Curated annotation (Swiss-Prot):
Domain of life assignment: Eukaryota
A GO MF label: magnesium ion binding
Residues engaged in binding Mg(2+) 2: D487, D491
UniProt note: domains: The Asp-Asp-Xaa-Xaa-Asp/Glu (DDXXD/E) motif is important for the catalytic activity, presumably through binding to Mg(2+).
Similarity comment: family membership: Belongs to the terpene synthase family.
Top-level taxonomy: Eukaryota, Viridiplantae, Streptophyta, Embryophyta, Tracheophyta
Pathway note: Secondary metabolite biosynthesis; terpenoid biosynthesis
Gene3D superfamilies found in the cross-reference section: 1.50.10.160, Farnesyl Diphosphate Synthase, Terpene synthase, N-terminal domain
Enzyme Commission numbers on file: 4.2.3.19
Name assigned to this protein: Ent-kaurene synthase-like 1
């Protein structure tokens, strides 16, 4: 599956290779096998191109068909095929100037050049004069001016890339500056064929021969594409949610890619989109890769390159995705995130950029990327979107269209649908089980408490979705429900006496329940806490092979004591410093009982040294701080009315009147960004890290949940979350296969 990358062959590029004359005679082809392939591969409608092509890719088919017709005419073979090809061109000639049609790169220059070549071959083309005149006019405008100016490096690269359309007027010395170590120009057989025809460069020939050796008697429109295609397969498997079924294969791809990265391989570093994808996937998987590589792809440099000149949407999209894998003190990625975000937003609004496929498909991908940033995109939501938008027959287009059979894989889609729906059935059973648990623990009798079981379970199912993680999901969801209950109890439901009573009961743990409760509320909450903590401890023993219940108790005690501190501040109208508030606040935000016990339930064994490792504390603190600040930013107005302490209001108070609300919020948002990037660094780093990656991932998963909940407002009150949760838990995804 990963070993052999299968690209569709390109009639267009094959035709240009076929038109190379022999070294011995200009009357004979250098590669007669390519001419034979053209003879053998005309489609039933008289065209050459990909079968079942998209209705908006007629220009591409016309370009390929004319190139093949020229090759046959040049060598005086296939007269019947030539006539059928000309008939196809005549019947579809209105598409040549149709602006709704997708235009291949360089089409407005290359196609008119082929028309002139047809005249030289005394080939009578059945095109109306107004069609030809319109094309020649566009060609002349493009050649004389160019949208980016005639002297930019991007413009030069563009003219070099479409060298076959410039012909004898080309500056071939300039073109050869783009020759790669493999002998090609831009990894393009058609460009390389044109260069070899004019210059007889030995390295160009060696490249063409190597491609034909691999593909037989035809060539693809781009070669090699192995590194990019394998990375794209990894990306697709992750987005479909089935990467866990291919861990060995993915590991081999990552190791090979990292080796190429360290070697400075051209296939990565001369191709912006491959470089960006390699950086993102390697960094996310724990490999040590520096963002310094993007120095060559800064905004100015990018727009002075071929991709920038073309305003290539997919490449900018990949740069944008890479920029989100951001560590602290990486200004290069911060700037990259800013300009790529701006470019993509403009792309959506104007549609003026280049897309290497039907625009509606690219638009959907860009829209999702902008609305679902990496730090707010829950895995199961990504999986569902990717399944629903997966195109088995995805066609991309450069100078000619192509497909990669490895990435357009029907089996991937079928497995993803089955996996999603199987997991969903398990999730539905667990949610019903949790509903019974709420009733059994009498939590529904606590009138002051918000009932948020659906949200709590959704956050677990959307991130810890694999069947084998059931214990972790249930722990996550139950503790989510209990932290909500306790939060409401400390906020509005309980007196100070009750709060202290609850804490004392947890501290004593083994108590005579009939004599130590000062209210029924305390009895219900304590009983639910004790039974749930004990249950989690028992399950953790199965995973860990040792007792960890005492750790779970301490996690809860830390939370309860921090909540009591906030309650006492409020009741005494004390105003802590911002530092005092945050030191207490990252604990009182109540993520500890949700995330920390789950660490014992996801697979890796954690030693006592691991549990006490400062790294674990740093992960928790960064997550809790980020969450607290998100809550305080989004909940500022509501909490101010309720008289609650808040990081925004404390920042304004400490400013002694010199800091207004807008400035305070800007400061808080900056702190959120820095804490989030620090957490990501801690999660992804492999060096000097003792905590297993599967455990560290839980902290990042929670950050994603929080950012999704707080993307617009206080997420617990957002009606949109209901449909989002249903998409993960209740609505199966459909398979649209053959």
């Amino acid at each position: 599956m990963f070993d052999k990358i299968e690209l569709s062959v390109s009639p267009y590029d094959t035709a240009w290779v076929a038109m190379i004359p022999s070294l011995n005679s200009v009357q004979a082809p250098f590669f007669p096998e390519c001419t034979k392939w053209i003879v053998d591969n005309q489609l039933s409608d008289g065209s050459w191109g990909l079968p079942h092509h998209h209705p908006l890719l007629i220009k591409d088919t016309l370009s390929s068909t004319l190139a093949c017709v020229l090759a046959l005419k040049k060598w005086g073979v296939g007269e019947t095929l030539v006539n059928k090809g000309l008939q196809f061109i005549e019947l579809n000639s209105t598409s040549l100037n149709d602006e709704k049609q997708h235009t291949p790169i360089g089409f407005d220059i290359i196609f008119p050049a082929m028309l002139e070549h047809a005249k030289e071959l005394a080939l009578n083309l059945p095109l109306k004069s107004d069609v030809i005149d319109a094309m020649l006019h566009r060609r002349d405008v493009d050649l004389k001016s160019g949208s980016g100016g005639s002297n930019t490096e991007g413009r030069k690269a563009y003219l070099a890339y479409i060298a076959e359309g410039i012909g004898k007027f080309q500056d071939w010395e300039m073109v050869m500056k783009y020759q790669r170590k493999n002998g090609s120009l831009f990894n393009s057989p058609s460009t390389t064929a044109a260069a070899f025809s004019h210059l007889r460069n030995a390295d160009c020939l060696q490249y063409l021969q190597s491609v034909l050796q691999k593909y037989g008697n035809a060539v693809p429109t781009i070669y090699p594409l192995d590194v990019y295609s394998r990375l794209l397969m990894v990306d697709i498997l992750e987005r479909l949610g089935i990467d866990r079924h291919f861990r060995k294969e993915i590991k081999l791809v990552l190791e090979e890619t990292y080796r190429y990265w360290l070697q400075g391989n051209e296939e990565i570093f001369l191709d912006c989109i491959t470089c960006a994808m390699a950086f993102r996937i390697l960094r996310v998987n724990g490999y040590d890769v520096s963002s310094d590589v993007f120095t060559q792809f800064t905004e100015d440099h990018f727009f002075d390159s071929l991709g920038g000149y073309l305003k290539d949407t997919r490449t900018v999209l990949e740069l944008y995705r890479a920029s989100q894998i951001l560590y602290p003190d990486e200004p290069l990625l911060e700037k990259q995130n800013s300009w790529t975000n701006h470019f993509l937003e403009k792309c959506l609004s104007s549609g003026s950029s280049y897309a290497d496929g039907p625009r509606e498909c690219i638009t959907e991908v860009v829209h999702n990327a902008l609305n679902c940033p990496y730090y707010a995109d829950l895995e199961r939501l990504t999986n569902r979107r990717s399944i629903e938008n997966y195109n088995v027959d995805e066609t991309r287009i450069l100078k000619a269209s192509y497909r990669c059979l490895n990435t357009g894989n029907q089996h991937f889609l079928k497995l993803a649908v089955e996996d999603f729906n199987l997991c969903q059935l398990i999730h539905q059973e667990e949610l019903q089980q949790l509903g019974r648990w709420v009733v059994e623990k009498r939590l529904n009798k606590l009138k002051f408490a918000r009932q948020k079981l659906g949200y709590c379970y959704f956050s677990a199912a959307a991130t810890l979705f694999a069947p084998e993680l059931s214990d972790a999901r249930l722990s996550w969801a139950k503790n989510g429900v209990l932290t909500t209950v306790v939060d409401d109890f400390f906020d509005v439901g309980g007196s100070v006496e009750e709060l202290i009573n609850l804490i004392q009961l947890i501290e004593k743990w083994d108590v005579d329940e009939s004599t130590h409760f000062c209210s029924e509320q305390v009895e219900i909450i304590f009983s639910a806490l004790r039974s749930t903590i004990s249950e989690i401890g028992d399950k953790a023993f199965t995973w860990q092979g040792r007792k960890v219940t005492s750790h779970v108790i301490k996690i809860w005690l830390d939370l309860l004591k921090s909540m009591l501190t906030e309650t006492l501040w409020t009741k005494s109208k004390s105003i802590p410093t911002l530092d005092e508030y945050m030191i207490n606040g990252y604990v009182s935000f109540a993520l500890g009982p949700i995330v920390l016990p789950a660490l014992f339930l996801v697979g890796p064994k954690l030693t006592e040294e691991d549990v006490r490792d400062p790294e674990l504390h740093d992960l928790f603190k960064a997550m809790g701080t980020c969450g607290r600040l998100l809550n305080d930013w989004r909940g500022f107005q509501r909490e101010s009315k309720e008289g609650k302490l808040n990081a925004v209001s404390l920042h304004m108070i400490q400013g002694n009147g010199g800091v207004n609300e807008e400035e305070a919020i800007r400061k808080i948002k900056g702190l959120i960004n820095s804490q989030r990037s620090e957490l990501l660094r801690l999660v992804l780093r492999e060096k000097n890290s003792n905590i297993p990656r599967a455990c560290k991932d839980l902290f990042w998963k929670m950050i994603k949940v929080l950012h999704l909940f707080y993307l617009k407002d206080d997420g617990f009150t957002s009606n949109e979350m209901i449909s989002t949760a249903n998409a993960v838990i209740t609505e199966p995804v459909a398979f649209h296969g053959p």
